Amino acid sequence: MGIKISTGEPGGHNYLKPELIKDIVSKLNGTIVENCTAYGGKRQRLEDHLKCVEDHGFTKIAKVDILDSEGEFSIPTKTGSIHLREDIVGSHLENYDSILMLSHFKGHMMGGFGGALKNMSIGVASTKGKLNIHSAGAENQEQEYVWSHLPAQDDFLESMAEACSAVMDYYDNKGGIVYINVINNLSVDCDCDSNPEEPCMKDIGIVASLDPVAIDRASLDLIYKSNDPGREHFLERVETRHGAHTIEHAVTLGLGTTFYEMVSIDK
C-alpha cells in the first residue's frame, strides 16, 4: 500500500511527523509515497528531495518512494472536466494497488486550505503534473511561465478537483483509496512553505472517510464550529482564496458528497 503524505519543505515544521504516523504506517506495512515539487526549493530535484526525506526522519519508519523519480504517465480526467483532459502522475503510482491519502489539514497560500483533495491532486501529480494543474491546463506549461501567468483562481481550484477525478477513476479499477485528515498544527500556510506562519489554532483531531469530498467538508466545518480565537485568521485565508470552491467542483464532478454523518470514536 502507498501512503501519500507531504514530506514537508525544509525549513517548515508543521508537516505530519514520523513519530505521529509511524504506527499506522507500520500496521499497514506501507510505503510512504510522494512526488517532486514544481517551485524550486529543496524538493524539486530528486537528490534534494531524498535528503529532505531522510532529514525529516521518514526513512526511519518506512520505505519511501518518490513516484516521479523515473518518469510519469497520464491518466484521463472525468467527463465533465472543464480545464484538464489529463492528470500527469509519477510512473511508480502503477506499483500500488491501493492508497492511504494521509493528509495534514491546514491552510494554503493558493488553495485556501489543503486536505485530501489537495493531497490527491497536487500531491499525486508529478512536477509536470503540478504545472498542468497550477496553469489550469494552459498550453504553455514551462515552469517560469506558469508562475508568472497564473490562471483565474476558480480555474485553478477546479483543476485540482479535476485532477482528483483522474486519480479516483484510476483507483476505482484497483484497490481503492482511504482518506485520513489530521487537523493539527493549523497554520494558514502549507507544508510546501519553507517559512510558514506559526499555527494559529489548537489541534482539533483526526477525521477518516472513504469520501474525499465529505472529509474535506467535515474538516472545514470543524474549523467553522471551533471557538478557538485563531479561527477567524485561519478562515480569512480559506475564504479570500475561495477555497471551498474546490469542494463544490468536486461535487459537480461526482467525486463525493458534502452530506455526512460524523461518528466519534473517542474513548
Give short role names for the model-derived ranges.
Residues 1-267:
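Extended, low-polarity segments enriched in aliphatic/aromatic residues
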